[in-house]
């Protein structure tokens, strides 16, 4: 049996401490973890895909088994091209579960070989979202406890 490979998809606009917590914990379980940065067509991004990928690379540099790539199309198809047997999703609250369960069921229908793993976020991040970070920063609120330092600097620069 080869490496245990997983994909953790997301918009990561920007990456938060909650995202990083899930990535670090998944990196302990899987031999290779692809962080796939997606463009969400229903959201207007603050950062380009390239900017998001660079921030993620910087904040995951201490995790040698993490690779950062951009992806488009179906996550389950992307996972298959990477030889992944798992998709990792973070759950903040019960409210996330129903939506994530629907996606997991659809992915299972599309490719039964790829499992979905849910990791519960650390309770101190259960309220945290990229949207919330952007909203607080837009009004000059302090986001230093919500995102890694390099991300804080980049977000602040966008709202100057």
UniProtKB/Swiss-Prot annotation:
Gene3D superfamilies: HUPs (3.40.50.620). One of its GO terms (cellular component) is cytoplasm. GO terms for biological process: coenzyme A biosynthetic process. Pathway: Cofactor biosynthesis; coenzyme A biosynthesis; CoA from (R)-pantothenate: step 4/5. Keywords: ATP-binding, Coenzyme A biosynthesis, Cytoplasm, Magnesium, Nucleotide-binding, Nucleotidyltransferase, Transferase. GO terms for molecular function: ATP binding; pantetheine-phosphate adenylyltransferase activity. Substrate binds at residues 11, 43, 75, 89. It catalyses: (R)-4'-phosphopantetheine + ATP + H(+) = 3'-dephospho-CoA + diphosphate. The keyword Magnesium applies. Its cofactor is Mg(2+). ATP binds at residues 11-12, 19, 90-92, 100, 125-131. Reversibly transfers an adenylyl group from ATP to 4'-phosphopantetheine, yielding dephospho-CoA (dPCoA) and pyrophosphate. HAMAP family: PPAT_bact (MF_00151). Belongs to the bacterial CoaD family. This is Phosphopantetheine adenylyltransferase. It comes from Listeria monocytogenes serotype 4b (strain CLIP80459). The lineage of its organism: Bacteria, Bacillati, Bacillota, Bacilli, Bacillales. The gene is coaD.
């Amino acid at each position: 049996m080869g490496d245990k490979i997983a994909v953790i998809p997301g918009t990561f606009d920007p990456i938060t401490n909650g995202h990083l917590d899930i990535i670090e914990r998944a990196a302990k379980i899987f031999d290779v973890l692809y962080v796939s940065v997606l463009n969400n067509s229903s959201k207007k991004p603050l950062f380009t895909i390239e900017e998001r990928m660079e921030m993620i690379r910087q904040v995951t540099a201490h995790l040698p088994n993490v690779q950062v790539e951009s992806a488009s199309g179906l996550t389950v198809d992307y996972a298959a091209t990477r030889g992944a047997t798992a998709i990792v999703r973070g759950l903040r609250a019960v409210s996330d579960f129903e939506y994530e369960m629907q996606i997991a069921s659809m992915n299972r229908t599309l490719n039964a070989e790829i499992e979905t793993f849910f990791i519960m976020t650390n309770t101190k991040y259960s309220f945290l979202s990229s949207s919330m970070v952007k909203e607080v920063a837009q009004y000059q609120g302090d986001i230093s406890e919500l995102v890694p330092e390099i991300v804080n600097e980049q977000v602040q620069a966008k709202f100057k």
